[in-house]
Amino acid sequence: VSATPIFAIDYKSAEFEVIGPRPIRFRMGLNTSVAIWLDELDAHVAFIIVPSGMPATMTNARTPGDGLRWLQDMLRKTRLQWLPVKAHVSDDEGECMGGVCVFDVPFALVDEWLMWLDQDAAVQATGSGYVMLRSHPAIRSTRDVD
């Protein structure tokens, strides 16, 4: 896993903006708006993945944007429901990173994406309103929810 622990701290403090017919912005922690939003979308769980690593299958990837394009291309070939995301990672500079929000995807598939994208974690939003990190399988702790 190549992302640094500092990136994980930034990830936890970021604000996530899901773009779509029912847009929403939220941070990590308990958020009843997330529970209502997921209920309106008839979804139980959402995972936000903001690629910062390079996909294992791309030997000539040059930027994190290459990882995002790879993930979007893969998602377009599935029947999974997903929306684009902006992760606002810095309040001071307005820095944003692109990502995706995928609904009701099996946990094992999220773990595969984390491994293929060389990501430390994904953001997991649940129907109870909890927004937390789901760690890469190699660094997973007992605090993660399956």
What do the predicted segments below correspond to?
Residues 1-73:
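N-terminal, charge-rich interaction modules
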Residues 38-39, 92, 112-115:
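A general structural signal for short secondary-structure junctions and capping/turn motifs
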Residues 69-83, 118-120:
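Structural alpha-beta junctions
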Residues 77-103:
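Short, intrinsically disordered low-complexity segments
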Residues 96-97, 104-130:
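Short, compact, well-ordered microdomains
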Residues 99, 134-146:
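Short, low-order "capping/linker" segments at domain edges
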